[in-house]
């Protein structure tokens, strides 16, 4: 890396790195460093009356106070932080005091990793600390961390910019309190979910991510190309159709927790790559699945929060069963006053116009129109967990017809905090009906609906061999974690959410500067001074530019021959 691309602190740290090596200290040792305690455990287990406990810990230096022959550092490990008391004569018991005077005081920085061996004690100020007897350099940080300071519970110099936090999650995790806890709770959500399904006797499976047909949901897929087979493939939008094949194959229940991909918009609750759990159980229906879902979410909420309640954006949400159950057409009538029962596509389209819905177009069929009405007027109203049930057949191409309500299906979506959390059916297992549903989807595709499903002939073949009555559900893990941790954006529960490309400062190539008579070695210097394109130099005062670039030459010890003010004036004149 060009030295001009480094900050002053980065240069100092790289020089320190070289000094450590010159002293024979490996700043990145390969050997295992054995630890026997974590910061939180040391504090929790300390008792004043006990014999001093000998510990070996390792972590990152987050703050330090150097006071001559004695110093304090704050060490951060994977569990928390603890104060370490370091004295020159303790870590340098012999005549050689280099480890303290040079290495610790001069060459180590905030962000560096060190190992500490010593004993636990309580300081005169009452803080449980480690009295260091040995210090080992474990990893040198050559880029300074943003240092967040706290006073009276208020954070200063915070690393708060969302774009920076999401791009540099590794920094966010180090410096911002509570971030790591969110992701530990995410792990608890997934672990509790998996344990519950395993205890129920269901089998965790893996199905293809690259699929020849993007089936199982109404969504726009990502497309890629397999060079060897010379075919287009799709990143899966759902696991449904493959999991149902396994039910045909004889499994009692199967589930998969994995990534799905949808080539659609990004917002506070949508990421194009997301984690979903899908479960299919034979001989069950959607009524059983509603009860099972209630028990499952109760258990997860207790595991994460210690109770059946969570708080999101100031709203207390209770996952204690039972949840309200409301047919979708009743919900629409309740919120809009319109009864859509028995209405044709054209009648519903007219209702959309009367409701002054602007996003409606001719490519939308009856199911899509109903979905749009529900999304605009109803969905956001359901804060407490609510099962929206009995969707029209046009909205549910993979769902069994309702046993007593003509034109409707045995489907529910679970709404929580105004968003869909889960989608479930009594699964359609009539192969002839399923084929007709697929054909209707193809008719919608011909009208321009780019979210219509494609016919999956192999899935139809599997159904023809016979699939038992089955209920299935898909639960969005990311949204579930948002609810359980009180987050209001999906980006806060994804380690690395999808981002727009990072903005890169436009810089002219060296050749453009050289056309003005500027030596190639001086181009990075001029750009370091802020003149990233030759046009940036057009109106600058020649003396200012001369002063800027000569100052950089001196500061960074580049040892270039300085141009004269006349030389700089000639460069600028050529631009006029």
UniProtKB/Swiss-Prot annotation:
Q: Where are the transmembrane segments?
A: none
The record, for PROSITE patterns, names: AA_TRNA_LIGASE_II (PS50862)
UniProt xrefs under SUPFAM superfamilies: Class II aaRS and biotin synthetases, Nucleic acid-binding proteins
Q: Where does Mg(2+) 1 bind?
A: 413, 420
Q: Which cofactor does it need?
A: Mg(2+)
Which top EC class applies here?
Answer: ligase
Q: What is its EC number?
A: 6.1.1.6
Question: Keyword set for this entry?
Answer: Aminoacyl-tRNA synthetase, ATP-binding, Cytoplasm, Ligase, Magnesium, Metal-binding, Nucleotide-binding, Protein biosynthesis
**Reaction catalysed?**
tRNA(Lys) + L-lysine + ATP = L-lysyl-tRNA(Lys) + AMP + diphosphate
**InterPro entries xrefs:** Aa-tRNA-synt_II, aa-tRNA-synth_II, aa-tRNA-synth_II/BPL/LPL, DUF4332, Lys-tRNA-ligase_II, Lys-tRNA-ligase_II_N, Lys-tRNA-synth_II_C, NA-bd_OB-fold
Any one Gene Ontology MF annotation carried by this entry is: lysine-tRNA ligase activity
- Any single Gene Ontology cellular-component annotation: cytosol
Instruction: List locations, semicolon-separated.
Output: Cytoplasm
Query: Where, by residue number, does Mg(2+) 2 bind?
Result: 420
- S-S bonds: none
CDD domains named in the record: LysRS_core, LysRS_N
> One GO BP annotation here?
lysyl-tRNA aminoacylation
Give the record's subunit note. Answer: Homodimer.
HAMAP family with a match to the protein in the record? Lys_tRNA_synth_class2 (MF_00252)
Its family?
Answer: Belongs to the class-II aminoacyl-tRNA synthetase family.
Please give the name of this protein.
Answer: Lysine--tRNA ligase
